[in-house]
């Protein structure tokens, strides 16, 4: 590969997609910190509180895996109108995992911010 060329498929969009994919599990747990939500509410919450646009085909496998790991519980609730909804809640283990993930993320992002600050300042992105 010639100096200065990027490997095939190594685009900012692809990199951002990988970053988001890694953050969705923590975001799903965080969305349930305040209480019980059903799947579509989790998706809407993530969209309203962050830049994470998560599709149903992405969130439900994650929720199922987190439930299988004992981090979430779920309960079907009959709706007054329409179909029953599956509501998800954090277990004590899920709350503990979220606290550990949030601490690790905080340390990681602070370190990265320190590294990127001079780059962003030079580009005029930061004052």
Identify the role of each PLM range.
Residues 60-67:
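Short, hydrophobic-biased segments on the C-terminal half of alpha helices
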């Amino acid at each position: 590969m010639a100096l200065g060329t990027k490997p095939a498929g190594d685009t900012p969009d692809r990199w951002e997609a990988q970053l988001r994919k890694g953050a969705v599990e923590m975001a799903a747990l965080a969305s349930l910190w305040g209480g019980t939500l059903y799947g579509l509410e989790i998706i809407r919450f993530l969209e309203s509180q962050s830049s994470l646009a998560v599709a149903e085909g992405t969130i439900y496998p994650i929720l199922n895996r987190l439930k299988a790991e004992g981090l979430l519980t779920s309960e079907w609730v009959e709706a007054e109108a329409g179909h029953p909804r599956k509501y998800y809640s954090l277990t004590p283990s899920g709350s503990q995992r979220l606290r550990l993930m949030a601490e690790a993320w905080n340390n990681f992002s602070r370190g990265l911010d320190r590294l990127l600050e001079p780059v962003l300042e030079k580009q005029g992105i930061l004052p």
